[in-house]
């Protein structure tokens, strides 16, 4: 991958800042790019445009265009990722990347562009590392007896972590977070179900520690068969993505997740699991309209997760006709309210025990005497919840080892949480 030049342009195609890294593509091609953009409608726009042997790879952000040009057979995905990393870095520096912040920070942006890319190849794109030596006031480097001294993270192999970090209390927090996307038909059939998971960490560790994370044997990764792992009753995770700190070669060899963590919060890995999921909270709704004068609802909610677990902050959002009025509610647990701005009833249950517990809510609405004869399409019932200490996939952390040359003791904390994602029940 090699980008020839990078341009930051306003919505009309005026170049605000540009940097020519290789000199093999004329800088004047930026005007051709904006002409092509203006010719196309927004729906037809693609992130890559090719013309006269030149590739234009761009991202639109806040009415700005970040454009990379190249005439080589470049890795377009890598260039796109770099442009998004540029946005992330600029947002870290200026809070919001927009035309005004660019005009106010020309010098800093040029310095960042020079450090983030060299001769068209990405270098350091970690905001915390860049902030060590490029500040809002300008470019600052320490000078020692032998001349200029760059921060160690720039010259070392671990670009995402600086040296010399020190904490009085060494701790690492690990959260396994899973969201469930679910769609159930009006007759109770699960049409779509998916688990989207992430392992998030907050590192407060001194020095340059190495961490080793072990997961339970039930969890398999894609292509596990290549390593001779037995499939059996294992759950195979798909679309697994790791933070750049993970040693992929070691993971490919023995499925060990070994890494030197960045300082602070980061996402260690994400994954997806396409499998039939039993709805953790099951909802049934029966509605009855009486002579176009009133409508009544009976909503039943039932837990279908382990009895020892509790779902917190459960919200069941039941759509009602937009012309409904004079609401009346009765529920066996929790509170109900009418949200006219959403045309919905919101049934809130602070704590919903597992083990098959069942609750009931009844609602009554008046309807205008004159109504639209054309039946309106009914939006689905939406459910929101949070179940701590619970994962649907069964993923568990067997161990989290922390190894540092000074030999200090560190406290690892592990939490699990299951959340509702796009969780819907269609109604008849």
Swiss-Prot record:
Disulfide pattern: none
Gene that specifies this protein: apm1
Entries under InterPro entries matching the protein: Adaptor_comp_med_subunit, AP2_Mu_C_sf, AP_mu_sigma_su, Clathrin_mu, Clathrin_mu_CS, Longin-like_dom_sf, MHD
Compartment annotation: Golgi apparatus, trans-Golgi network; Cytoplasmic vesicle, Clathrin-coated vesicle membrane
GO molecular function annotations of the record: clathrin adaptor activity
Name by which UniProt lists this protein: AP-1 complex subunit mu
MHD domain segment(s): 169-426
Keywords: Acetylation, Cytoplasmic vesicle, Golgi apparatus, Membrane, Protein transport, Transport
GO cellular component: AP-1 adaptor complex; clathrin-coated vesicle
Positions bearing N-acetylalanine: 2
Main location as per UniProt: Golgi
Superkingdom, taxonomy of origin: Eukaryota
Residue spans crossing the bilayer: none
GO terms for biological process, alphabetical: endosome organization; hypotonic response; intracellular protein transport; lysosomal transport; sorocarp development; vesicle-mediated transport
Function, in words: Subunit of clathrin-associated adaptor protein complex 1 that plays a role in protein sorting in the trans-Golgi network (TGN) and endosomes. The AP complexes mediate the recruitment of clathrin to membranes and the recognition of sorting signals within the cytosolic tails of transmembrane cargo molecules. Also involved in early steps of phagocytosis and macropinocytosis.
Alphabetical list of SUPFAM superfamilies matching this protein: Second domain of Mu2 adaptin subunit (ap50) of ap2 adaptor (SSF49447), SNARE-like (SSF64356)
UniProt similarity note: Belongs to the adaptor complexes medium subunit family.
Subunit structure: Adaptor protein complex 1 (AP-1) is a heterotetramer composed of two large adaptins (gamma-type subunit and beta-type subunit), a medium adaptin (mu-type subunit) and a small adaptin (sigma-type subunit).
Disruption phenotype: Cells are viable but display a severe growth defect and a delayed developmental cycle. In this mutant, phagocytosis drops by 60%, the protein transport between the TGN and lysosomes is probably defective and the contractile vacuole is lost.
């Amino acid at each position: 991958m090699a980008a020839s030049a990078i341009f930051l342009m306003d919505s009309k195609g005026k170049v605000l800042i540009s940097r020519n890294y290789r000199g093999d593509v004329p800088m004047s091609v930026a005007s051709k790019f904006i002409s092509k953009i203006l010719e196309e409608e927004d729906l037809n726009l693609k992130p890559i445009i090719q013309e006269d042997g030149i590739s234009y790879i761009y991202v639109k952000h806040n009415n700005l265009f970040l454009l990379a040009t190249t005439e080589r057979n470049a890795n377009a995905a890598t260039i796109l990722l770099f442009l998004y990393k540029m946005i992330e870095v600029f947002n870290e520096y200026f809070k919001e990347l927009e035309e005004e912040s660019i005009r106010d920070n020309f010098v800093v942006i040029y310095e960042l562009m020079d450090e983030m890319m060299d001769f068209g190849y990405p270098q350091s794109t970690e905001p915390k590392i860049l902030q060590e030596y490029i500040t809002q006031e300008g470019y600052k480097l320490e000078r020692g007896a032998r001349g200029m001294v760059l921060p160690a993270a720039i010259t070392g192999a671990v670009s995402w972590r600086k040296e010399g970090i020190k904490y009085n209390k060494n701790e690492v927090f690990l959260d396994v977070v899973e969201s469930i996307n679910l769609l159930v038909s009006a007759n109770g059939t699960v049409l779509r179900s998916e688990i989207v998971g992430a392992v998030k960490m907050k590192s407060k560790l001194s020095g340059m520690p190495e961490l080793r994370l072990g997961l339970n044997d039930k969890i398999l990764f894609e292509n596990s068969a290549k390593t001779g792992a037995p499939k059996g009753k294992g759950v195979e995770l798909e679309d697994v993505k790791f933070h750049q700190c993970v040693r992929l070669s070691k993971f490919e060899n023995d499925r060990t997740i070994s890494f030197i963590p960045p300082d602070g919060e980061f996402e260690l890995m994400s994954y997806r699991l396409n499998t039939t999921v039993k709805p953790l909270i099951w909802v049934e709704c029966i509605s009855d309209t009486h002579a176009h004068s009133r409508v009544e609802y009976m909503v039943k909610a039932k837990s279908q997760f382990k009895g020892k677990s509790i779902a917190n902050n459960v919200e069941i959002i039941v759509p009602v006709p937009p012309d409904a009025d004079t609401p009346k509610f009765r529920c066996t647990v929790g509170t109900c309210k009418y949200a006219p701005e959403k045309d919905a009833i919101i049934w809130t249950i602070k704590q919903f025990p597992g083990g098959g517990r069942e609750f009931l809510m009844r609602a009554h609405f008046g309807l205008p005497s004159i109504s639209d004869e054309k039946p309106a399409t009914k939006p689905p019932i939406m459910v929101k919840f949070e179940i701590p200490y619970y994962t649907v996939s069964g993923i568990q952390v067997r161990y989290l080892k922390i190894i540092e040359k000074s030999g200090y003791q560190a406290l690892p904390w592990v939490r699990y949480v299951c959340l509702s994602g796009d969780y819907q029940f269609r109604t008849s």
